Amino acid sequence: MSPELIQNLVTSYFSSLQAMNAVEWAENFTKDAVIYDPVGKPPSKARENAQAFFGLLSMAFEKLELSQDNVFIADNGAAVKWTMRVLGKSGKQGVAEGISVFEMHESGKFQQVSSYWNDAALMAQIKD
Protein backbone atom coordinates (compact mmCIF):
# COMPACT_ATOMS: atom_id res chain seq x y z
CA MET A 1 0.00 0.00 0.00
CA SER A 2 1.44 3.36 -0.97
CA PRO A 3 2.33 5.94 1.68
CA GLU A 4 0.18 8.46 -0.24
CA LEU A 5 -2.91 6.25 0.05
CA ILE A 6 -2.33 5.78 3.77
CA GLN A 7 -1.77 9.53 4.29
CA ASN A 8 -4.96 10.34 2.36
CA LEU A 9 -6.98 7.94 4.50
CA VAL A 10 -5.49 9.32 7.73
CA THR A 11 -6.32 12.86 6.58
CA SER A 12 -9.88 11.80 5.73
CA TYR A 13 -10.24 10.21 9.19
CA PHE A 14 -9.18 13.39 10.99
CA SER A 15 -11.07 15.83 8.75
CA SER A 16 -14.35 13.89 8.98
CA LEU A 17 -13.90 13.58 12.75
CA GLN A 18 -13.31 17.32 13.05
CA ALA A 19 -16.38 18.02 10.88
CA MET A 20 -18.35 15.52 13.01
CA ASN A 21 -19.41 13.78 9.81
CA ALA A 22 -20.27 10.21 10.86
CA VAL A 23 -21.06 8.95 7.36
CA GLU A 24 -17.78 10.14 5.83
CA TRP A 25 -15.82 8.95 8.87
CA ALA A 26 -17.34 5.44 8.70
CA GLU A 27 -16.35 5.13 5.03
CA ASN A 28 -12.68 5.03 6.11
CA PHE A 29 -13.19 1.60 7.72
CA THR A 30 -13.71 -1.98 6.63
CA LYS A 31 -17.11 -3.44 7.55
CA ASP A 32 -15.71 -5.29 10.57
CA ALA A 33 -13.14 -2.70 11.71
CA VAL A 34 -12.72 -2.00 15.40
CA ILE A 35 -11.55 1.07 17.25
CA TYR A 36 -10.07 1.36 20.72
CA ASP A 37 -10.75 4.97 21.69
CA PRO A 38 -9.11 5.29 24.07
CA VAL A 39 -7.10 2.10 24.50
CA GLY A 40 -8.23 0.43 27.72
CA LYS A 41 -11.93 0.84 27.00
CA PRO A 42 -13.90 -1.90 25.24
CA PRO A 43 -13.47 -1.98 21.46
CA SER A 44 -16.17 -0.51 19.26
CA LYS A 45 -17.21 -1.52 15.75
CA ALA A 46 -16.39 1.60 13.75
CA ARG A 47 -19.09 1.43 11.08
CA GLU A 48 -21.82 -0.08 13.23
CA ASN A 49 -21.40 2.42 16.06
CA ALA A 50 -20.47 5.56 14.09
CA GLN A 51 -23.78 7.36 14.58
CA ALA A 52 -23.80 6.70 18.33
CA PHE A 53 -20.14 7.77 18.63
CA PHE A 54 -20.79 11.04 16.81
CA GLY A 55 -23.96 11.55 18.83
CA LEU A 56 -21.83 11.52 21.98
CA LEU A 57 -19.34 13.95 20.43
CA SER A 58 -22.06 16.40 19.46
CA MET A 59 -23.58 16.23 22.95
CA ALA A 60 -20.24 17.13 24.58
CA PHE A 61 -18.59 19.47 22.07
CA GLU A 62 -19.72 22.64 20.35
CA LYS A 63 -16.53 22.67 18.28
CA LEU A 64 -13.73 20.17 17.68
CA GLU A 65 -10.36 20.93 16.07
CA LEU A 66 -7.74 18.28 15.34
CA SER A 67 -4.19 18.69 14.14
CA GLN A 68 -1.94 15.94 12.86
CA ASP A 69 1.28 16.99 14.61
CA ASN A 70 3.45 14.11 13.38
CA VAL A 71 2.56 11.30 10.99
CA PHE A 72 4.71 8.18 10.76
CA ILE A 73 3.90 5.74 7.96
CA ALA A 74 5.46 2.29 7.83
CA ASP A 75 4.45 -0.70 5.75
CA ASN A 76 0.62 -0.94 5.93
CA GLY A 77 0.03 1.33 8.86
CA ALA A 78 0.55 4.70 10.44
CA ALA A 79 0.99 6.29 13.83
CA VAL A 80 -0.16 9.87 14.31
CA LYS A 81 0.68 12.18 17.21
CA TRP A 82 -2.24 14.61 17.35
CA THR A 83 -3.66 17.52 19.32
CA MET A 84 -7.37 18.08 19.87
CA ARG A 85 -8.86 21.40 20.92
CA VAL A 86 -12.52 21.51 21.86
CA LEU A 87 -15.15 23.97 22.90
CA GLY A 88 -17.50 22.16 25.23
CA LYS A 89 -21.25 22.70 25.36
CA SER A 90 -20.44 24.28 28.74
CA GLY A 91 -18.58 27.09 26.96
CA LYS A 92 -15.25 25.90 28.41
CA GLN A 93 -12.25 25.01 26.27
CA GLY A 94 -10.19 21.86 26.54
CA VAL A 95 -7.03 20.44 24.99
CA ALA A 96 -5.87 16.85 24.69
CA GLU A 97 -2.94 15.16 22.99
CA GLY A 98 -2.64 11.59 21.92
CA ILE A 99 -1.30 9.03 19.51
CA SER A 100 -3.47 6.95 17.20
CA VAL A 101 -2.17 3.81 15.51
CA PHE A 102 -3.87 2.87 12.24
CA GLU A 103 -3.77 -0.64 10.76
CA MET A 104 -4.69 -0.91 7.09
CA HIS A 105 -6.54 -3.69 5.33
CA GLU A 106 -5.57 -4.74 1.80
CA SER A 107 -8.84 -3.14 0.61
CA GLY A 108 -7.35 0.29 1.34
CA LYS A 109 -9.43 0.98 4.45
CA PHE A 110 -8.67 0.85 8.16
CA GLN A 111 -9.19 -2.46 9.93
CA GLN A 112 -8.19 -1.20 13.38
CA VAL A 113 -7.48 2.12 15.09
CA SER A 114 -6.02 2.29 18.59
CA SER A 115 -5.93 5.73 20.22
CA TYR A 116 -3.80 6.44 23.27
CA TRP A 117 -5.03 9.47 25.21
CA ASN A 118 -6.81 10.54 28.41
CA ASP A 119 -10.44 11.25 27.55
CA ALA A 120 -11.40 11.73 31.22
CA ALA A 121 -8.87 14.58 31.58
CA LEU A 122 -10.35 16.34 28.55
CA MET A 123 -13.90 15.97 29.83
CA ALA A 124 -12.82 17.36 33.23
CA GLN A 125 -11.54 20.50 31.49
CA ILE A 126 -14.92 21.26 29.90
CA LYS A 127 -17.14 20.17 32.79
CA ASP A 128 -19.67 22.72 34.06
Predicted features, each with a name:
Residues M1-E27, K31, I126-D128:
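Short, low-complexity N-terminal intrinsically disordered segments enriched in polar/charged residues
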Residues E65-L66, K81, G94-S100:
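Short, surface-exposed coil-to-beta transition loops
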Residues L5, V23-D75:
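A solvent-exposed, acidic/Ser-Thr-rich amphipathic alpha-helical stretch
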Residues S90-Q93, A121-K127:
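A short, polar/proline- and glycine-enriched secondary-structure boundary/capping micro-motif
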